[in-house]
Swiss-Prot record:
The gene is moeB. Binds 1 zinc ion per subunit. Its cofactor is Zn(2+). This is Molybdopterin-synthase adenylyltransferase. The lineage of its organism: Bacteria, Pseudomonadati, Pseudomonadota, Gammaproteobacteria, Enterobacterales. ATP binds at residues 41, 62, 69-73, 86, 130-131. Zn(2+) binds at residues 172, 175, 244, 247. Its EC number is 2.7.7.80. Homodimer. Forms a stable heterotetrameric complex of 2 MoeB and 2 MoaD during adenylation of MoaD.
Length: 249
């Protein structure tokens, strides 16, 4: 396991002193490789906390460029980076947040085989996309490689998060998407409040850190929903669908 430098020990001191986390947890983060898919609102929010917390290797995957309408909620981008690939804009911002980590941008739209190969190189994947087809593609790749997937979504004033560990008897994302169909609304059509994105992205980062460090209990086997209008959280148990084409028997 990678050892922390003196600078890193000072930088991450407030995490290292947490009971049950300690140096082992911080070194586990430094050793970890996380793939973040989508560098829009959720990806920006989640990645900056993974970077600042000391996750040692981040791969950023997106094929989009920064536009002016993104800046309301995509906090790593700026007026100066409008027109740039999102992964490059995000890489530069994250490097300023933490120069001690390695960041690899991948500005591409990958096919199933390419995505599966990339997933297999990582310890955990964050789904920060807004497209059900891409989410299903990610789920299939993560299930095949048994790489945990932390999935988040946010629209209007509502958000949700789920962790898929792919353990025996656990559901997968396809079990969830089968319940709601393929035609999910996007922020372009329905709108979204900026801080809601930060709440859900931060929850994704927290769940990722817990999984990577073996710290706490992940939000697996359930959907955690947040209603920003009333500031209320609720949970719904998510069962594995025996007829699921990905994880079903």
């Amino acid at each position: 396991m990678a050892e922390l430098s003196d600078q890193e020990m000072l930088r991450y001191n407030r995490q290292i002193i947490l009971r049950g986390f300690d140096f082992d947890g911080q070194e586990a983060l430094k050793d970890s490789r996380v793939l973040i898919v989508g560098l829009g609102g959720l990806g920006c929010a989640a990645s900056q906390y993974l970077a600042s917390a000391g996750v040692g290797n981040l791969t950023l995957l997106d094929f989009d460029t920064v536009s002016l309408s993104n800046l309301q909620r995509q906090t790593l981008h700026s007026d100066a980076t409008v027109g740039q690939p999102k992964v490059e804009s995000a890489r530069d911002a994250l490097t300023r947040i933490n120069p001690h980590i390695a960041i690899t941008p991948v500005n591409a739209l990958l096919d199933d085989a390419e995505l599966a190969a990339l997933i297999a190189e990582h310890d955990l994947v964050l789904d920060c996309t807004d497209n059900v087809a891409v989410r299903n593609q990610l789920n299939a790749g993560c299930f095949a490689a048994k790489v945990p997937l932390v999935s988040g979504a946010a629209i209007r004033m509502e958000g949700q998060i789920t962790v898929f560990t792919y353990q025996d008897g656990e559901p997968c994302y396809r079990c969830l998407s089968r319940l709601f169909g393929e035609n999910a609304l996007t922020c372009v059509e329905a709108g979204v409040m900026a801080p809601l994105i930060g709440v859900i992205g931060s929850l994704q980062a927290m769940e990722a850190i817990k999984m990577l460090a073996g710290y706490g209990k992940p939000a697996s086997g359930k959907i955690v929903m947040y209603d920003a209008m009333t500031c209320q959280f609720r949970e719904m148990k998510l069962m594995r669908n025996p007829g699921c084409e990905v994880c079903g028997q």
